[in-house]
A protein has these predicted regions:
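Beta-strand-dominated lipid-handling architectures at cellular/organellar boundaries
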Residues: 1
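N-terminal carbohydrate-binding/catalytic regions of secreted carbohydrate-active enzymes
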Residues: 33-34
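A short, structured active-site edge motif that brings together acidic residues
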Residues: 63-68
Length: 177
């Protein structure tokens, strides 16, 4: 069994702090997630799915998942995690469709990052997201990322819409086990 605990701390364009907490566990070919603040503020979600991986030089994994959310937003969803690693290049995307129980409009979330490991511990990249939590004026937020790894601990700073007035920042800290 392996897993991680991650905290993401965002600062919105109106200087409001937004925390997101994620716990992930992998057991054999199964992936489990518990998240707080990801689908909406003050909302908890749980997800489970099967990991399908293939490739050696180019390693790819696909994880279709189902889940639910309770809190400010209550609903069920379907999601997909995608990861590709090729040498020093990493591409990652997580997407989900959440269908609220109250009959309000469904919501599609997506978050992705592409990075290049220039040193064993350092990886700059680009990121894109569509999250309800940040409520920015843009439908899709584009940005840059700068990450560092020190053993099992990693930290990444994301800057979304860095060249306009809707910019916001996010710090992600993750501990793997």
């Amino acid at each position: 069994m392996s897993g991680y605990v991650a905290g993401y701390f965002g600062l919105t364009p109106d200087d409001e702090a937004v925390p997101i907490v994620v716990v992930g566990l992998d057991h054999k070919s199964w992936h489990f997630l518990a998240r707080y603040g990801y689908e909406d503020r003050d909302t908890f979600s749980a997800w489970a799915g099967r990991i399908f991986g293939f490739g050696d030089q180019v390693a790819v994994s696909l994880t279709p998942m189902v889940g639910f959310a309770v809190g400010n937003t209550d609903g069920i969803g379907a999601g997909l995690e995608f990861a590709l690693d090729w040498g020093r290049l990493s591409v990652y995307n997580e997407s989900e469709l959440l269908i609220p129980f109250d009959g309000s409009e469904s919501w599609f979330y997506a978050w992705g990052n592409t990075s290049y490991r220039v040193a064993d511990w350092f990886q700059p990249g680009v990121s894109i997201q569509r999250l309800r939590v940040f409520q920015s004026e843009r439908e899709v937020d584009r940005g840059i990322s700068v990450g560092a790894e020190f053993g099992r601990l990693s930290a990444t700073v994301y800057g979304y819409n860095p060249f306009n007035e809707n910019r916001f920042w996010q710090l992600g800290v993750e501990w793997g086990f």
